Amino acid sequence: MGAIETQGFKLDDSGRRIVVDPVTRIEGHMRCEVNVDANNVIRNAVSTGTMWRGLEVILKGRDPRDAWAFVERICGVCTGCHALTSVRAVEDALGIRIPKNAHLIREMMAKTLQVHDHAVHFYHLHALDWVDVVSALKADPKKTSELQHLVSPSHPLSSPGYFPRRGRTGLKKFVESGQLGPFMNGYWGSKAYVLPPEANLMAVTHYLEALDLQKEWVKVHAIFGGKNPHPNYLVGGVPCAINLDGNGAAGRINMERLNFVKARIDEMIEFNKNVYLPDVLAIGTIYKQAGWLHGGGLSALNVADYGTYDKVAYDHATHQLPGGVILDGNWDEIHAIDPRDPEQVQEFVAHSWYQYADESKGLHPWDGVTEPKFELGARTKGTRTAIEHIDESAKYSWIKSPRWRGHAVEVGPLSRYILGYAHALKGNKYCQRVKEQVDFAAEAINHAIPKALGLPETQYTLKQLLPTTIGRTLARCLEGQYCGEMMLADYHELVANIRAGDTATANVEKWDPATWPKEAKGVGTVAAPRGMLGHWIRIKDGKIENYQCVVPTTWNGSPRDAKGQIGAFEASLLGTPMVNPEQPVEILRTLHSFDPCLACSTHVMSEDGRELTTVKVR
């Protein structure tokens, strides 16, 4: 390949090649290869999806009312979001509108997922890319308590005695036993970690707090959807009946269950306020002071989202996280996005292991084709079953390349927050809270926290802070906080609506396929934890004729397209300096900021296949 330029990025594969395989994700496994120059700066990145999902093919010929139960199994971590997207697609195709109670319950379930997923992602999957666990053993509990008071004065669990009891004692037992358990395979002691021991102990302690709380929060799904993971959904509404007096069938929603939900919402809000946000701000500030403002990639240029969280059901103008597309980093211009428009959302396969009749052109998901074609390029090193070095000039991924009007875009909480901030600047009253959150966080990172910690204050602009790995992690945290607040409003609206006499939770007027048109097509969208999610369905003679999912990681993890444009994963790694390529903390730090969901052991190899070290990717 040599040196080329695309989208303003310079790619050069002449340096040393490092392979991380597999990086596990929701849709399967991801492989990542990078080239580093003589200064250990990443100059080329190649993201490969190494497993074919194929659920679109499985759905053909099935009853569209059952589709949600199949597609929900795409993922057990962001559980429910595919089911919700699916029922919305079917309802859109058939012209079904759900009752107000069903809308509010679905909103609460979706926001519960966001709060839960974002907290679990940060503490249990991503924080250890920033936090040196073993260093926490050196922390002074009194200084840790003082640090906690500085960054979160209102958190009640902050006494000097709490941190040894809750965090350090258990961690010490792990280390002394020689079995680090969940902390195995880390690069503890690497110079890529810059937090002081006290910050590390604070974060490890909160890791354990989050582990306790997350199992309580998902009970909201069990109340409204019957179980977690994979709560139940229903075309036309939700499967739970309402009876505030507690009479009738078991499982009906009564005030006891609603009070339980309220208690969980309060916990979420308090945790985000007192623990999650202060931790992210403190960690982000310290790393920013160390000059770690890498990983922005496409987020500095092109971001997109369909928009979500209608304040008024079916009124997209009331989205509390409005959608759109921003191109070339121009926050002053927001392009409208329409998932129905065949010229807007298209998937390309020039570098994907699929085949189209004309691979220079993209297909809209309603016309999507999922026909596998596994072949390796001439420059591939290894065999079909043991690839050492992928050839990115040919087909190299099971992920397609979705594009918006031909542009590669980043999706996810950071994209939603950049869009929300831009909309707020234009006077959108439904997302002013986004601007408040971002302005607060920027002031804290530039001024309040440095001042409290005795560090120099800074003057970074939002365009310097947000489009970074730190900004991506911060946006996820802010979205969790916002979702908890919105969920509380949804709860009060639901209770008031029920008390006013409305107990309807489903619209079954079009449940019978005899009421359906001979042919119909629809689209459903959801703000999944990792970004904008869309399902497109075609129904013919009461059965699914075609079904296509374009998931967040398809956007972010896409390979190059016919024009040579790289995706968000690949772009985010470019220009990142590595302290030690044999301990690739920086690669994991940025990849994890996109929220890969599952965990497995991976190996880092040199170009000749020699194993350098073992990497733990979560």
Swiss-Prot record:
It is a peripheral membrane protein. GO terms for cellular component: plasma membrane. The keyword Transmembrane does not apply. Its EC number is 1.12.99.6. One of its GO terms (molecular function) is hydrogenase (acceptor) activity. Ni(2+) binds at residues 75, 78, 597, 600. Keywords: Cell membrane, Membrane, Metal-binding, Nickel, Oxidoreductase. The keyword Ligase does not apply. It catalyses: H2 + A = AH2. Pfam families: NiFeSe_Hases (PF00374). Its main location: membrane. Its cofactor is Ni(2+). SUPFAM superfamilies: HydB/Nqo4-like. It comes from the Bacteria. Binds 1 nickel ion per subunit. It is found in: Cell membrane. This enzyme recycles the H(2) produced by nitrogenase to increase the production of ATP and to protect nitrogenase against inhibition or damage by O(2) under carbon- or phosphate-limited conditions. Belongs to the [NiFe]/[NiFeSe] hydrogenase large subunit family. Heterodimer of a large and a small subunit. PANTHER family: HYDROGENASE-2 LARGE CHAIN, UPTAKE HYDROGENASE LARGE SUBUNIT. This is Uptake hydrogenase large subunit. It comes from Rubrivivax gelatinosus. The gene is hupB.
